[in-house]
């Protein structure tokens, strides 16, 4: 067989040619392979050497502990524009005072424990723990102002130290959990026995009490006033004299009265000792008169004015625990001032935040309430004659302002229903300013040279259970507060003090309750305006009454006219408390002149006769002369009947929510008088 020349399959004879011929040229590549196969070298397996025996490696000691300094208080940062401070973080720290408010106090902490915790900072005067159980807040009063400052600083430092200690303990616990050996306790940068500022072992927070809640009298501030010192005596000489009784904080001289000098001590006990030692003592040929200073005037001029800028940081826990206390009303201020009968804490009217408080008087006092600028060419003589007509019987048309609804304080109270004449309403600068753009209302304004001389006022909507004793107490408190503000202002020496010499509270002799209004004669027109500003449109706060007090001028003006009005009169009653009374000398709260009845008493009618003849009994149950004093509607004359008087009383009661049930509850009246301390 020839090589490569087979004619069949596998070179067998008889097979087709070029079919799967392994020797054919087509099965050989034309070009050599680019990656020729190379034989791999022989690989030997080399196992890893065995590991060395186990050895215990030494553990490096921990780094030495580093004491962390106490971080200082962050600086106060003014709020940026557009940045809203959360409501819970707006805790405002007031100016330095002797009252320190502690927050986050344990709810079971008693007063003695709180006092013991604050004793290291200074002598504690008193502790108020009434809100500890409910809010965890206590107020601590110190004798020394410096002690209060040290307490606030120490309590805050202790609070921050406790926070830093918790941070270090957390870091130590985390490091101990990451390593097996025991981690040494961290070292502190303060002694372990420093427990100052802790209440029952718990850190608290402290800030000064708000100025509105701190008493502003001289006894609480350690402030004295020397009334008749020599004008030539300098404040340095006066400081040397008072320095013998304690550290003096400040000595200053009155700008308007050089003979009056104010001395303020750090410690209230030193001020009390200096008052008792120097009052009445002769110095440089003049007897000294030393007294405590009066409370400051309300408003921005007050010494304890609270700034609305945050002064110190507030701990996060305090933001949820602290609740701002409501500001107390002015009527709740103590009003005794050397008087045993002017009782403290008897709140007769609830002051609102509007302009009706007694502290909203302008610099001009009562005269400012009657100064008007004449517009539209109205003559000053006509305006003065209209305002000064005390008992004129000529009816004056109501002003256009009262016809429109009486915006402001000078408008009509009940619109056209009451029918009060405009000449009996008080006019104030507030009403003039509100209607400055109203040409029609400007016609009723008085010129600046006109002064209202009326002094007798009518107090309306008095609760029917109100007695003459309660009304006297209310007027005494008002006079004391007004006179203290006049003395403290030192702005106008010619400003007259508030006092009154006549009082009449008409009584229904059947049920022994008042008929809803009363009359008071003040000793000056300025005092009448001050009483109007203090009580007009103020809600009463006794006997759950919903009445709103209203003050207007009375029809009969002046003490002499009132005496003539009640001349030869007798009242069918059995008590002098139901009679009109006068005071000589006038009563001002400090001088508690006893009331002297102005009229006599006749035998009281029996209940049987009253039952048999109701109309006659009704006519005799109320004094018919009382109706002639009030400012009746212009449609009725002065001689109104007793029946219309009774209807007027009922109308006032119905309008303000008082019904007949308010009058007949004698048991409730006795309980209220007993609660206020007027009865045993």
From Swiss-Prot:
Lineage: Eukaryota, Viridiplantae, Streptophyta, Embryophyta, Tracheophyta
Chain's gene name: PLA2
Expression by tissue: Highly expressed in shoot apex and inflorescence apex, at intermediate levels in roots and at low levels in leaf blade and leaf sheath.
Any GO MF annotation of the entry: RNA binding
Protein name: Protein terminal ear1 homolog
Phenotype of the disrupted gene, per the record: Plants produce threefold the number of leaves, and leaf size and plant height are strongly reduced compared to wild-type. Shoot apical meristem (SAM) shows a higher rate of cell division and internode elongation is significantly reduced. Some inflorescence branches are converted into vegetative shoots.
Physiological role: Probable RNA-binding protein. Involved in the regular timing (plastochron) of lateral organs formation. May regulate the rate of leaf initiation and the duration of vegetative phase. Seems to be redundant to the function of PLASTOCHRON1, but to act in an independent pathway.
Ranges for region Disordered: 294-415, 593-680
Source organism superkingdom: Eukaryota
Organism: Oryza sativa subsp. indica (Rice)
Compositionally biased region (Low complexity): 328-340, 379-403, 602-621, 634-648
């Amino acid at each position: 067989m020839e090589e490569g020349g087979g004619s069949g399959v596998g070179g067998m004879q008889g097979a087709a040619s070029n079919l799967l011929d392994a020797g054919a040229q087509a099965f050989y590549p034309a070009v050599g392979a680019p990656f020729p196969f190379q034989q791999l070298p022989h690989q030997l397996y080399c196992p890893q050497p065995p590991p060395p025996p186990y050895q215990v490696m030494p553990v490096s000691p921990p780094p030495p502990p580093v004491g962390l300094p106490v971080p200082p208080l962050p600086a106060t940062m003014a709020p940026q524009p557009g940045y809203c401070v959360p409501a819970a973080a707006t805790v405002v720290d007031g100016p330095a005072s002797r009252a320190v408010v502690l927050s986050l106090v344990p709810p079971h902490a008693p007063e003695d424990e709180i006092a013991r915790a604050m004793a290291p900072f200074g002598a504690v005067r008193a502790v108020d723990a009434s809100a500890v159980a409910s809010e965890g807040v206590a107020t601590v009063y110190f004798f020394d102002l410096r002690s209060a400052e040290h307490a606030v600083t120490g309590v805050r430092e202790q609070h921050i130290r406790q926070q830093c200690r918790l941070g270090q303990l957390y870091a130590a616990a985390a490091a101990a959990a990451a390593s097996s050996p025991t981690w040494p306790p961290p070292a502190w940068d303060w002694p372990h026995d420093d427990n100052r500022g802790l209440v029952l072992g718990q850190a608290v927070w402290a800030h000064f009490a708000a100025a509105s809640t701190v008493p502003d009298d001289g006894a609480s501030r350690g402030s004295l006033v020397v009334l008749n010192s020599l004008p030539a005596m300098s404040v340095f000489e006066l400081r040397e004299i008072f320095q013998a009784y304690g550290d003096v904080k400040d000595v200053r001289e009155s700008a308007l009265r050089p003979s009056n000098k104010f001395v303020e001590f750090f410690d209230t006990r030193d001020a009390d000792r200096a008052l008792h030692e120097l009052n009445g003592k002769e110095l440089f040929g003049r007897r000294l008169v030393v007294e405590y200073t009066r409370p400051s005037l309300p408003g921005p001029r007050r010494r304890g004015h609270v700034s609305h800028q945050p002064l110190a940081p507030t701990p996060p826990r305090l933001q949820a625990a602290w609740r701002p206390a409501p500001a107390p009303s002015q009527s709740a201020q103590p009003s005794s001032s050397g008087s045993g009968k002017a009782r403290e804490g008897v709140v007769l009217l609830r002051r609102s935040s509007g302009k009706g408080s007694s502290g909203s008087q302008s610099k001009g006092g009562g005269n400012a309430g009657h100064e008007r600028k004449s517009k539209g060419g109205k003559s000053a003589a006509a305006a003065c004659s209209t305002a000064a007509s005390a008992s004129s019987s000529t009816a004056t048309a109501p002003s256009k302002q009262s016809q429109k609804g009486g915006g402001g304080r000078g408008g009509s109270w009940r619109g056209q229903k009451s029918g009060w004449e405009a000449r009996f309403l008080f006019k104030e600068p507030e009403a003039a300013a509100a209607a400055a753009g109203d040409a029609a209302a400007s016609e009723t304004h008085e010129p600046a040279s006109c002064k209202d001389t009326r002094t007798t006022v009518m107090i309306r909507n008095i609760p029917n259970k109100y007695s003459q004793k309660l009304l006297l107490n209310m007027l005494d408190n008002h006079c004391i507060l007004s006179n203290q503000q006049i003395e403290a202002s030192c702005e106008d020496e010619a400003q007259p003090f508030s006092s009154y010499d006549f009082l009449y509270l008409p009584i229904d002799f059947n049920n022994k309750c008042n008929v809803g209004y009363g009359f008071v004669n003040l000793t000056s027109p300025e005092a009448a305006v001050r009483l109007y500003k203090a009580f007009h449109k103020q809600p009463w706060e006794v006997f759950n009454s919903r009445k709103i007090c209203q003050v207007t001028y009375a029809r009969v003006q002046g003490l002499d006219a009132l005496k003539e009005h009640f001349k030869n009169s007798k009242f069918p009653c059995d008590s002098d408390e139901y009679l009109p009374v006068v005071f000589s000398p006038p009563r001002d709260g400090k001088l508690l002149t006893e009331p002297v009845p102005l009229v006599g008493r006749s035998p009281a009618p029996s209940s049987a006769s009253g039952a048999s003849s109701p109309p006659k009994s009704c006519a005799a149950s109320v004094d018919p002369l009382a109706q002639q004093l009030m400012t009746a509607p212009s449609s009725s004359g002065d001689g109104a009947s007793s029946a219309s008087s009774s209807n007027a009383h009922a109308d006032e009661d119905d309008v303000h929510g008082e019904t007949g049930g308010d009058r007949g509850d004698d048991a409730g009246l006795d309980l209220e008088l007993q609660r206020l301390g007027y009865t045993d």
